[in-house]
Design a protein with these regions (language model features):
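Extracellular/periplasmic envelope-modification machinery, especially enzymes
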Residues: 1-7, 11, 15-317
Length: 317
């Protein structure tokens, strides 16, 4: 649709203008009406177009996509002391009661809070560190520290940490890398936003809490739509990757060292290779453009939590 409208615009507007020819009112009216009808048709039949694209995906891949989407809806909460709760409910009586019961049972806990990539990290812990019996996450979508979101209040997180500082053995944090690139694609890093994260983490460290800051994860930028279909047909899962996320990782390494913050680069550990790390034995390691799938949380988490640097930070204190 975009290409068709662009062609009409070029043929009947841009071309004549370049040749300094006037456009008749009739052609102008026809062009406007045609563009409107094309856009309207696209809007009306968007579901049919989407279904056509889905049908175009080979059946074996469609089954994998359906499985991945279904698993991504799982909420990993064991009903005991691996607690998965929203930031909005951080002061709810039921959550706080459960917290106190688990404190009596296990003592100190591993705490995570933030956005959807923190959720990926929590799920990876749930699936790869069975000996961690007391783990809490408070999370929200669209939770960048610089973005005002009533469902993601960093002051609530800091207040919770202040109230429970003697019982938090570690605080884990991570974030999506593209949120800290200028214009999403980079290549420049939006350093002032990363510096806001540093300030947030330093406030937690001031409570004498051990913090591990995990860098961004690879972003193949493949949605489960035409991008996936195109990648499959080209047998190339690197067509849309946001490679400049590595610039964010490098800057985070730099400022974490300057501020004495323990930092783990997921990029350095995973060494993501789309040829072998995206589609593995009929499993997709990502559920969308940047979030790990259930399989990916196990697959990448296993690499991270068995890395030497994680073991040094987490087990040797």
């Amino acid at each position: 649709v975009i290409f068709l409208v662009s062609f009409l615009s070029w043929k009947y507007f841009e071309g004549p203008f370049r040749k300094k020819n006037l456009i008749s009112k009739k052609i102008l009216l026809i062009s406007i009406v045609s563009s409107f009808l094309i856009c309207l048709t696209n809007f009306i039949y968007k579901d049919s177009i989407k279904n056509y694209l889905n049908i175009s995906i080979p059946i074996e891949y469609q089954q994998v996509i359906n499985k991945t989407k279904k698993e991504s809806n799982n909420v990993l909460d064991d009903g005991n002391c691996k607690i998965n709760e929203s930031i909005n409910n951080i002061n709810e009586k039921s959550f706080l009661k459960r917290l106190e019961i688990c404190k009596q049972k296990y003592g100190s806990f591993l705490y995570l809070a933030g956005g959807s990539h923190v959720q990926d990290l929590y799920n990876s812990i749930y699936l790869n560190l069975p000996n961690e019996k007391f783990v809490i996450i408070n999370k929200s979508g669209s939770c960048a520290i610089y973005f005002k979101n009533e469902n993601c209040d960093y002051d609530k997180i800091l207040k919770f940490i202040d109230n429970n500082k003697s019982d938090i053995k570690f605080f884990f944090y991570t974030q999506i890398g593209s949120d800290y690139l200028k214009n999403f694609y980079g290549p420049q890093v939006e350093t002032k936003y990363v510096d806001m994260l540093v300030s947030f983490i330093k406030k937690i460290k001031d409570h004498n809490i051990d913090v591990i800051w995990f860098g961004p994860q690879p972003q193949p930028n493949i949605e489960m739509n035409y991008k996936f279909l195109r990648s499959v047909k080209a047998n190339n899962f690197n067509l849309f990757s946001l490679t400049h996320v590595s610039k964010v990782d490098q800057y985070m390494k730099k400022v974490s060292k300057e501020n004495d913050i323990k930092f783990i680069s997921k990029l350095d550990i995973i060494k993501y290779d789309p040829r072998k790390d995206y589609y593995i034995n009929n499993n997709i390691s990502y559920s969308d453009s940047d979030h790990w799938s259930f399989f990916g949380e196990k697959y990448f988490g296993n690499q991270i939590f068995n890395s030497q640097i994680f073991r040094e930070y987490f087990y040797i204190q």
